Design a protein with these regions (language model features):
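Eukaryotic intrinsically disordered and solvent-exposed regulatory patches
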Residues: 80-87
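Catalytic and GAP-homology cores of small GTPase regulators
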Residues: 1-75, 83, 92-94, 101-169
Length: 169
């Protein structure tokens, strides 16, 4: 299932995200195998997160988002050769923070946008009690502020998989 979800064009990205976030043991194994198809070595967090989240849409349920981000964080952390992060937990916390920043910066209903200083302050001591490098957080802030990560069912692709599409596979 993992390779099918990852490499089959035209599948409904909302359905993939919903499936990957499901709490059943089998679905969690598929999520791990799906996540293991990504190579994150040498990537900055936002680039890796963008490449991951372009293959499906995050479901709206908090527990499903948590499971998906936990799988991503573990894979991202395991693939890093730098010593920026002390644990996968630091990656996980920063992922949530980046998603909140993305929503804050790109949702027109948010009137007062988060500043760079607020983003850096919000992420104090998340790295095993230590701060992440200020430059790293600053680059993340500007990257997200300048270009949104597509989340929660937003899609530029209108082609969805339906029975008539199976012949094209």
């Amino acid at each position: 299932y993992a390779f099918f979800f990852r490499y089959t064009p035209g599948l409904d990205k909302n359905m993939i995200g919903d499936y990957l976030g499901d709490p059943s043991h089998f679905n969690i194994e598929v999520l791990r195998e799906f996540t293991d198809t990504f190579k994150f070595s040498g990537m900055v967090l936002d680039i890796a997160l963008r490449s991951y989240l372009e293959t499906f849409r995050l479901p709206g349920e908090a527990q499903k988002i948590q499971r998906i981000l936990e799988a991503f964080s573990e894979r991202f952390y395991d693939e890093q050769s730098s010593d920026v992060f002390v644990s996968k937990d630091a990656v996980f916390i920063l992922c949530y923070s980046v998603i909140m920043l993305n929503t804050d910066q790109h949702n027109p209903q948010v009137k007062k946008k988060m500043t760079e200083e607020e983003f850096i302050r919000n992420n104090r001591a998340i790295n095993g009690g230590q701060d992440l490098p200020r430059e790293y957080l600053s680059e993340l802030f500007h990257s997200i502020s300048n270009k949104a990560i597509t989340l929660f069912g937003q899609s530029g692709v209108s082609v969805e998989m339906n029975p008539s599409k199976w012949i094209e596979l």
